[in-house]
């Protein structure tokens, strides 16, 4: 906790400086060198030490150990590749699957040009970009959830 120096408002020199625009930020503790040289390194090293201690004391298990004599029926990729895996799995032609995956970033690159007339940052005033984002989010979640099901139930998520 720092002790802040209180200004003497009866001082004529201070009153002249205040009249010229010297504000409240003039008083207090400066960021250089107090914070940048002493406080920030302590916080950074403390965070690194805490994370290292947690990793040493309670290491997270990556998953079940591999068994070379028992292969699972279907090998799934990591969770963040589920939508891509599902696209390749449900489309009959692999070239079509690759083309669909290439169309996703190309379509996202076109969104600013579609809505170039609208200069607002508020998502409620940009209906096209908001609709594209919501549609993409729903489709990605649907594809990701469907990748965990067998191929015959993957499109309906086992609901129908």
Curated annotation (Swiss-Prot):
Q: Name one GO cellular component term.
A: plasma membrane-derived thylakoid membrane
State whether it acts alone or in a complex, and with which partners, per the record.
Answer: The 4 large subunits of the cytochrome b6-f complex are cytochrome b6, subunit IV (17 kDa polypeptide, PetD), cytochrome f and the Rieske protein, while the 4 small subunits are PetG, PetL, PetM and PetN. The complex functions as a dimer.
Q: What is the name of the protein in this document? A: Cytochrome b6-f complex subunit 4
PROSITE patterns (UniProt xref): CYTB_CTER
Q: Which UniProt keywords apply?
A: Electron transport, Membrane, Photosynthesis, Thylakoid, Transmembrane, Transmembrane helix, Transport
- Does the keyword Thylakoid feature in the UniProt annotation? yes
Which family, according to UniProt? Belongs to the cytochrome b family. PetD subfamily.
Entries under Pfam families matching the protein: Cytochrom_B_C
- Record-linked HAMAP family: Cytb6_f_subIV
- Organism in which the protein naturally occurs: Rippkaea orientalis (strain PCC 8801 / RF-1) (Cyanothece sp. (strain PCC 8801))
Show the stretches that span the lipid bilayer. 36-56, 95-115, 131-151
Could you tell me where this protein is found in the cell? Cellular thylakoid membrane
* Alphabetical list of SUPFAM superfamilies matching this protein: a domain/subunit of cytochrome bc1 complex (Ubiquinol-cytochrome c reductase)
User: What are this entry's molecular-function GO terms?
Assistant: electron transporter, transferring electrons within cytochrome b6/f complex of photosystem II activity; electron transporter, transferring electrons within the cyclic electron transport pathway of photosynthesis activity; oxidoreductase activity
| Any Gene Ontology biological process | photosynthetic electron transport chain
Q: Where is this protein primarily located?
A: membrane
Topology of the protein relative to the lipid bilayer: Multi-pass membrane protein
């Amino acid at each position: 906790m720092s002790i802040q120096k209180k200004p003497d408002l009866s001082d004529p020199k201070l009153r002249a400086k205040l009249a010229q625009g010297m504000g409240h930020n003039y008083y207090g503790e400066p960021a250089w060198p107090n914070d940048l040289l002493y406080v920030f390194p302590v916080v950074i090293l403390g965070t690194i030490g805490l994370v290292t201690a947690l990793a040493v004391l309670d290491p997270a298990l990556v998953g079940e150990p591999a068994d070379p004599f028992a292969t699972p029926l279907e090998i799934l990729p990591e969770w963040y590749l589920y939508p891509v895996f599902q696209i390749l799995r449900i489309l009959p032609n692999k070239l079509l699957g690759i083309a669909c995956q290439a169309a996703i970033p190309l379509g996202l690159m076109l969104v600013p040009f579609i809505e170039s007339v609208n200069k607002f940052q508020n998502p409620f005033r940009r209906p096209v970009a908001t609709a594209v984002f919501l549609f993409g989010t729903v489709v990605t979640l649907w594809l990701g959830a469907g990748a965990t099901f067998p191929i015959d139930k993957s499109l309906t998520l086992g609901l129908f």
